A protein has these predicted regions:
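Conserved class I S-adenosyl-L-methionine
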Residues: 1-39, 53, 76, 83
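Class I SAM-dependent methyltransferase SAM/SAH-binding core
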Residues: 43-99
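GHKL-family ATP-binding catalytic core of two-component histidine kinases
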Residues: 70, 101-103, 120
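A short acidic, Gly/Pro-enriched loop at the edge of an enzyme's catalytic core
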Residues: 95-109
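A short SAM/SAH-binding and catalytic strip from SAM-dependent methyltransferases
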Residues: 109-121
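A short glycine-rich, Lys/Arg-flanked "PGG" loop and its adjoining helix->strand segment in the class I
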Residues: 123-133
């Protein structure tokens, strides 16, 4: 799938994503965030934050930044963050996972839940995650 296909796909799914995929991926999402929550005060990047389903599960003493290529999915994540008062969410940005606009070693942990299968170049994606963490 190329980047434009991914953007189009998630634009289409943004309205129904939580209903269709939320319950299916919930156990894995919660388990992964639980692992990321192992230390207090971490700077965490969530690549492919989507509608922000995982954001409520991060420790409140962490600083979570989320990125996604879908503006429509990010709008839902921003609404969720505001509605739930998730002050630990430091920012939500429209960004390509293969070209992260962050300095080297900007984060203590990086999560990418269900993302590797939809990026055009998984090796580049993995290299970017290593670079920023």
């Amino acid at each position: 799938m190329d980047l434009q296909d991914t953007i189009r796909t998630y634009r289409l799914f943004s309205g129904s994503y939580d209903i269709v995929f939320g319950p299916v991926f919930h156990p894995g999402r919660k388990a992964a965030v639980g692992i990321a929550n192992d230390r207090p005060g971490q700077r965490i990047l969530e690549v492919g934050v989507g509608t922000g389903l995982s954001l409520p599960y991060f420790r409140r003493d962490s600083q979570v930044t989320g990125i996604d290529v879908s503006a429509e999915m990010l709008e839902k994540a921003r609404s969720r963050t505001a509605r739930l008062g998730l002050a630990h969410v430091a920012g939500l940005h429209e960004m390509d996972a293969e070209n992260l606009d962050f300095a080297d070693n900007s984060f203590d942990a990086v999560l990418a839940l269900y993302v590797a299968s939809v990026v055009p170049n998984p090796a580049r994606f993995a290299a970017e995650m290593r670079r920023v963490c």
